[in-house]
Amino acid sequence: VYKGVLYLLAATFTFSLVNLGVKLLNEPNFLIPNPHSYPVHELVFFRSIISLSICIVVVTRKKIPFFGNNKVWLISRGLFGSTGLFLFFMTLQHLPLAIATTVQYLSPVFTVVVAIYLLKENVKWLQWLFFALSMSGIFVLGFESSENDAVNFWWILVGVISAFFSGVAYNAIMKCKNTESPITVVMYFPLVAVPITGIWCLTGEFVIPVGIEWIIILLMGILTQIAQVCMTRAFISDSASVVAPLKYVGAIYASLFGYFIFDEMLTTFAVSGIILIVSGVVLNTWYKKIYLRS
């Protein structure tokens, strides 16, 4: 088993818990019957400030150069990653959890496409068929918007844009794999996000958390740090075409969370879309493993 595969599976599950936190803070549930409606920039700020604090402690103790070496790609990682996260949190607030997460998992496709130009990675034609199979699942979700009033196709498009920005961010990570410590790569995400969202919180809408909401926000920050480290190590350990598609597995976690916690019922279109996506992922990983062995 590829080390990168294990790292990304761990990252995907942890990120799913963070996404669950966003939903818990915005929709009625058994933990918070009447949650505040948090603006997206505030959620990104809290998530980022906790992650940044942890990064600073680690970097200081290990005496790692604070700003790194490959600053252009590190800043690019922060900018594209922060923008992708902001747009993704918007979709979490406006779409069912499973659908918002599934649309976001187009990012592995964009990751591989961008890697062809930036990293000169070699992708076989059969892999493109598997990617197309996964993408067809996204298009099936488009039919969901015509059947379900809770699904607005506009927010699906926002999710696609978010996935593209995330795909570019993942390539920036791989550009830094030979020059930077993983913690430095992780740190640039909140290092860019905190000043931007912090100013936004000061000048725009801001909701003061209460009670258990503080605990959820704290856990979101800590889990984000764990997920970021696992994800960064995954992309450093293996090629984009092997690692990136495994992010799709998070759609399964999201479906279960949505069903059991928020009573989000999946229609035939939604289930079919998720099955297509996961099938494409499994086939791609299997093919790449066989190809490398040969």
Task: Describe each region flagged by the PLM.
Residues 4-10, 59-87, 153-162, 208-226:
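Loop-to-transmembrane-helix transition segments
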Residues 12-16, 20, 49, 56, ...:
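Hydrophobic/small/kink-forming positions within alpha-helical transmembrane segments
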Residues 33-80, 165-169, 188-203:
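Transmembrane alpha-helices of multi-pass small-molecule transport proteins
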Residues 1-6, 109-164, 178, 278-294:
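Juxtamembrane helix-loop boundary signature in multi-pass membrane transporters
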Residues 42, 49, 89-122, 240-258:
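Specific alpha-helical transmembrane segments that line the substrate/conduction pathway
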Residues 252-294:
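C-terminal-most transmembrane helix of multi-pass membrane proteins
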Residues 1-39, 149-175, 294:
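Glycine-/small-residue-enriched transmembrane alpha-helix faces in small-molecule transporters
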Residues 100-106, 176-192, 228-260:
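Helix-helix packing/entry segments at the starts of transmembrane helices
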